[in-house]
Amino acid sequence: MDYLILMICIVVSGLLLYSSRTSKMKLPPGPPGLPIVGNLFDLGSLPHRSLAKLAKLHGPVMCLRMGRLRVVVISSDSAAKEVLQTSDTLFCNRFVYDSLTASQHHTFSMALLPPTALWKSLRKISASQLFTNARMNASQHLRRKQLEDLLSYVESCSRSGTAINIAQAAFNTSVNLLSKTFFSVDLIDPSSSNSVEFKEMVWQIMLESGTPNLADYFPVLRRIDPQGNRRRMKIQFEKILDLFNTMIRQRLDEKGGCFDEINDTLDALLKINQDNSEELDLSVIPHLLLDLFVGGSESTSSTVEWAMALLFSNPEKMKKAKEELETVVGKGIAVKEEDTGRLPYLQAAIKETFRMHPPTPFLIPRKTDSDVDLCGFTVQKGSQVIVNAWAIGRDPSLWENADTFEPERFLGMEIDVKGRNFELIPFGAGRRICPGLPIAMRMLTLMVANLINCFEWRLEGGAAPETLDMSDKIGFTLQRAHPFRVIPTSIIQGCDVSTALNN
């Protein structure tokens, strides 16, 4: 009995001390929650929109309770700057969803690792081997070849009157660009059903990453994985990792361990491993490639689809983009990489697409390992911190007519997407900014420019552009709720696509 009384006293004392400590903190405001589940039912099926509405009531730094998890939601450019830049070192750790622990991916992933020696090594390799300006310029011929394949495919659909799924076509191009750069081979044949299967694998990974999971909100449930998110994620991870491991083994056999001649990214990575396995262990390489393929292909293809849909559903904006292309490049002539810097209206349309439909509306969540002061509030240790880039892009205090597609707003405005302007952060900012930004911007700009300069488009059934459904859905990336399917009519000048591109 005395022991029981002692234990009760200890527990009560602990609760009183915790209550006293938290009462002295100024915690971020937020909506009241239900017992046990907290604010879980406030998210709905479109959490980026639900949280933006709640932020209008409770402020740009808002705290919700999702089961046992505290979630701090950032919905203003100034607060985002504090998290991503000013106090970056205090918010640099990642909150790892339970599904992403499948196949131990979180222990190798550049996107998910805390800022450890391995993370620093992977960032260094990305900066020096994958996405330097010199490497980007050296691989222009690869992008030209993939663009030629895309335009040839669209041209063939034009001749047959076949509707094109823009996201699927852009996805195929993105994957093959990355696979050419990394492995010197194409992973996808646009006319093959394998392309649909590969995209489905990537989408399932994005979907499982973004689906609310009880195991994230009630850690005691992680052991049993009640919704099966981690089990389903492991299936998709293993398929892609097995593919990459097979390609690595084949390359090692081909090279016989000699990597004096570097032909592609895989050669470069294997040489780093050969020279210093402590800098890059062989087991890390498939996970690095998984991050780059999944993040790069899906975000690029979804942005191309949104940009095309926005221009198509706003005929006056499409007309301006086409007139600029006709003036700078020539109507029906394939756009080259060096042309894109002379297309300010098209660049503005891409930025406006990012503003309205950022590919990852919550970026990648952060986690605090200690109590942190933020904008006059205390963010408690162990909190998940998410930046609602979608809400910032729709903030009427930052953007006039925030829900209207107006590329003109960016003309003459010194705002870019490189993490320096926190009104527009589709790739994040600070030291954890997306490393694939350079190649993503080059490729998606080229795809959009050529699709609108070399083809006219119409909806199936002859529906008017203004009737296009612009609703969205969310996995980890922001997708169109309904695929953008349109029928092309070629206006390519010259005898064929290859000639047009190489003139």
Curated annotation (Swiss-Prot):
It is found in: Membrane. It is an enzyme of class 1 (oxidoreductase). InterPro entries: Cyt_P450 (IPR001128), Cyt_P450_CS (IPR017972), Cyt_P450_E_grp-I (IPR002401), Cyt_P450_sf (IPR036396). Keywords: Heme, Iron, Membrane, Metal-binding, Monooxygenase, Oxidoreductase, Transmembrane, Transmembrane helix. Belongs to the cytochrome P450 family. It catalyses: (5S,9S,10S)-drim-7-en-11-ol + reduced [NADPH--hemoprotein reductase] + O2 = (5S,10S)-(9R)-7-drimene-11,12-diol + oxidized [NADPH--hemoprotein reductase] + H2O + H(+). It comes from the Eukaryota. This is Drimenol monooxygenase. Its EC number is 1.14.14.72. Heme binds at residue 471. GO terms for molecular function: heme binding; iron ion binding; monooxygenase activity; oxidoreductase activity, acting on paired donors, with incorporation or reduction of molecular oxygen. The chain crosses the membrane at residues 7-23. GO terms for cellular component: membrane. It is a single-pass membrane protein. Its cofactor is heme. Its main location: membrane. CDD domains: CYP76-like. Catalyzes the conversion of drimenol to drimendiol, a precursor of the sesquiterpenoid polygodial. Polygodial has been shown to be an antifeedant for a number of herbivorous insects.
